[in-house]
UniProtKB/Swiss-Prot annotation:
Its cofactor is Mn(2+); Zn(2+). Residues 7-105 form the PINc domain. The keyword Iron does not apply. Residues 126-161 are annotated as: Zinc ribbon. It comes from the Archaea. This is Endoribonuclease Nob1. Keywords: Endonuclease, Hydrolase, Manganese, Metal-binding, Nuclease, Ribosome biogenesis, RNA-binding, rRNA-binding, Toxin-antitoxin system, Zinc. Manganese; magnesium does not support nuclease activity. Binds 1 zinc ion per subunit. Toxic component of a type II toxin-antitoxin (TA) system (Potential). Processes pre-16S-rRNA at its 3' end (the D-site) to yield the mature 3' end. It comes from Pyrococcus horikoshii (strain ATCC 700860 / DSM 12428 / JCM 9974 / NBRC 100139 / OT-3). Zn(2+) binds at C131, C134, C147, C150.
Length: 161
């Protein structure tokens, strides 16, 4: 259904928090993510004016984003809103407007363009989880973020090339 739309911007919450008057699409989770009163009013005014439309990405697009996020080690770093923004942009072949480095990283891997309010990423990074105690490496975050071998905290670090 959404595939026939022209190329457009898919907006993350940072756009509304910064008060950028812009046209594009966002997702239900981004709307839920906006908590402060001023940003909420601003977003509602853009929706009322028809400048911002709310759309939900397909399950297939969401599954693709989760797959790529698992490959990069960033799946636990993404919020539901981040995943939806990436999935909607993937589905629409649109451009993402976000300051989130994890979102930018995955967008780059998928060949999606992105815009930022601040400085964006310089290179794509793949991540892994490593125990700070014993150095054991994990592809996903262990339960509770704790190493099952030594009980130390597990941190996300960039993979070496």
């Amino acid at each position: 259904m959404l595939r026939n739309l022209k190329k457009t911007l898919v907006l993350d919450s940072s756009v509304f928090i910064q008060g950028i008057d812009i046209e594009g699409y966002t997702t239900p989770s981004v709307v839920e993510e906006i908590k402060d009163r001023e940003s909420k009013i601003f977003l509602e005014s853009l929706i009322s004016a028809g400048k911002v439309k709310i759309a939900e990405p397909s399950k297939e697009s969401i599954d693709r984003i989760i797959q790529v996020a698992k490959e990069t080690g960033e799946v636990n770093e993404l919020s539901k809103a981040d995943i939806e923004v990436l999935a909607l942009a993937y589905e629409l072949k649109g451009e993402i407007f976000s300051d989130d480095y994890n979102v930018q990283n995955i967008a780059s891997l998928l060949g999606l363009r992105f815009r930022t309010l601040k400085r964006g990423i310089k290179k794509v990074i793949k991540w892994r989880y490593v125990c700070i105690g014993c150095g054991r490496k994990f592809s996903t975050l262990p339960p509770g973020g704790v190493c099952p071998d030594c009980g130390s905290k597990v941190k996300l670090i960039p993979r070496k090339r």
